[in-house]
Amino acid sequence: MFAQPAPDSVKLDNDFVRVLFLTDQPGTKTPLHRHESNRVMIYLDPMEIVLRYQDGEVDHQHWRKGQVAWSPGGRLHTGENLMDRTARVVEVELKKPPSGKPFAAGSRDPVKVNSKNVKVEFENDYVRVLRCKYAANVREPLHEHLNEARVTVPLHDVELKVTTAGAQDRTVTLAAGQPSWSAGPVVHAAQANRTVELIVIELK
């Protein structure tokens, strides 16, 4: 989180988002800086950090493995990693303001057709963030995403067999923290080769 992004840390960059995969070293401290963009943070490992803002506020943060958080941009601060081990974090920077359009959720919305395994982690004017749980070799119900675009990030290495309406079936292999970009509405379903959780960030 505090390391200066190297070119190979940028895993996805388009008109909508820039996604960074960062490995923070123990005891890392940053100079005074700000993040211009609002971000969705996905913690792949436990983290204990302290943020010291220019206005004097001190914010001690404790994050669990797999936790997801909203991080608004704009405030000048320094950061310090209090951990004695490395920690991986995925940062999804949002490049655009909300579209202002009503968020579309139809009858086949994943939260409706698979409510046991798909939960809304949080939602605001910019995003709806879903936590999707897959059992090994169990196909999820066919469902639809009607929003403009989305980023999917697995919390573990996984192979997914994906069935998409109007397209050929395909197999997708993703490493933990590797983002996958999808644009436009889609009707699909997936089956994972292992028990896994995926974080889906739907853009508004």
Regions found by a protein language model. Give the residues of each.
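Ligand-binding loop in jelly-roll beta-barrel domains
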Residues: G73-K95, E148, D157, A183-K204
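Short acidic-glycine-tyrosine-enriched beta hairpin
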Residues: L12-F16, D55-G73, G166-P185
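A short glycine-rich, His/Asp/Glu-containing loop-to-beta-strand
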Residues: A6-L32, E36-L44, V92, K112-T152, ...
